[in-house]
């Protein structure tokens, strides 16, 4: 009955060790993941259980809850602590509930989540912040807690990819590391303290990730931002998108671009498992005067893609996963008119996952990239090492 077991073992061993035959150019040779960016936010108001459920239905492997805290210490899923653009807060509460705060060095007057209790937040309903998207679901869906998102994700067998929003700001409101400690304890209770958990914790700041590296084995991802892309294709670094804000607050000079140098990646590898760079960091582009997206204007989004910048390859050499963002059906660019083709290009370069507002398009992009016949066999063998903890 078991006479073929030795042969199968040899085949799996051979597949694992035959690097040229890897199914994908990802770090582990495994299929890249599709992350529902704020859920299926291209279709439904972002950061709602309904948006997350649709992302799961469309085939997303992970859903992304951005996290802020209420005044009574509950995590809720919002892209920013400011509630104005993504909820109907102005129709429920008067202007006297607005406050003026410094957020990443920018004076901001708004309705801040951390001045509302969870009970008050639960009276709000989400709205679609992008005017070009379907507004018919405005006012229908609640603002979910992290606990509610976890229950949904676990019930559907998908992972979560939470982002800690504005840790320096949150420390000023709640105290040093309260934000991080609460997240770690919540995730440990739900998933255990293990790198095998279907969870990634991400942040644009660095100090919070370094702190959490000492508190958890759950995988951590360093996000890398920029303000824009310059006319020559270089990255524009303008505050507040020039540096991680914890570095600004500490008087440091390290920029986001510095994080992607060889030295920067080596440093990240000491406290995180991956990087999350904005997608223009990954592609070299050339201006050649062609209107590739057909909008009648020749601009930065029409630049011809001219290969990799080497960031993906360098990150993989440092043992770091690469998850890039954000792909949108209604805002493709950087040399591509077709959003699925854009994602396919990044997938072929070797990114380990993509964030998209339209998870169905992401799933289609992954399916469209050819795989060798050995993929299923390699998946069986490589799955044994897929969840290893890389940082040290």
Identify the meaning behind each predicted range.
Residues 6, 15, 28-31, 373-378:
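A residue-level detector for conformationally permissive "hinge/kink" positions
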Residues 1-4, 371, 388-392:
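Positively charged n-region of N-terminal signal peptides that target proteins for export
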Residues 370-388:
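A short, hydrophobic C-terminal helix/tail in secreted or cell-surface proteins
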Residues 8-9, 42-43, 380:
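Intrinsically disordered, low-complexity segments enriched in polar/charged small residues
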Residues 1-22, 383:
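Gram-negative bacterial Sec-dependent N-terminal signal peptides
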Residues 21-368:
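Phosphate-group recognition and catalysis centered on beta-loop-alpha active-site segments
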């Amino acid at each position: 009955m078991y006479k073929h077991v030795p042969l199968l073992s040899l085949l799996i061993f051979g597949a694992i060790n035959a690097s040229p035959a890897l199914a994908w150019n990802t770090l582990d040779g495994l299929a890249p993941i599709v992350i529902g960016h704020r859920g299926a936010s291209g279709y439904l108001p972002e950061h709602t259980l309904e948006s997350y459920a649709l992302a799961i239905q469309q085939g997303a492997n992970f859903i992304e809850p951005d996290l802020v805290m209420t005044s009574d210490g509950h995590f809720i899923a919002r892209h920013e602590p400011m509630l104005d653009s993504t909820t109907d807060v102005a129709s429920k509460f008067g202007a006297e509930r607005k406050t003026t705060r410094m957020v990443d060095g920018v004076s901001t007057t708004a309705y801040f989540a951390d001045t509302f209790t969870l009970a008050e937040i639960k009276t709000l309903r989400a709205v679609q912040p992008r005017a070009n998207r379907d507004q018919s679901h405005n006012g229908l869906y609640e603002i979910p807690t992290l606990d509610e998102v976890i229950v949904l994700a676990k019930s559907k067998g998908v992972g979560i990819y939470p982002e800690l929003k504005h840790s320096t700001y949150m420390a000023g409101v709640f105290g040093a590391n309260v934000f991080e400690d609460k997240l770690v304890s919540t995730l440990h209770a739900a998933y255990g303290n293990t790198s095998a958990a279907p969870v990634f914790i991400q942040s644009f700041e660095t100090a919070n990730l370094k702190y959490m590296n000492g508190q958890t084995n759950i995988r951590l991802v360093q996000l890398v931002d920029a303000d824009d892309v310059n006319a020559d294709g270089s990255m524009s670094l303008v505050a507040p998108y020039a540096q991680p804000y914890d570095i600004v607050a500490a008087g440091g000079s390290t920029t986001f671009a510095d994080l992607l140098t060889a030295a920067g990646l080596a440093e990240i590898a000491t406290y995180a498992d991956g990087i999350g760079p904005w997608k223009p960091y990954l592609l070299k582009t050339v201006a050649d005067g062609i209107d590739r997206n057909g909008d009648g204007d020749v601009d930065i989004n029409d630049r011809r893609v001219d290969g990799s910048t080497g960031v993906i390859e360098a990150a993989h050499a440092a043992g770091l996963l690469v998850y890039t963002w954000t792909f949108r059906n209604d805002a493709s660019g950087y040399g591509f008119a077709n959003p699925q083709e854009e994602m396919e290009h990044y997938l072929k370069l070797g990114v380990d996952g993509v964030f998209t507002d339209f998870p169905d398009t992401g799933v289609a992009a992954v399916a469209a990239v050819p795989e060798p016949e050995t993929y299923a066999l390699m998946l069986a063998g490589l799955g044994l090492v897929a969840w290893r903890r890389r940082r040290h």
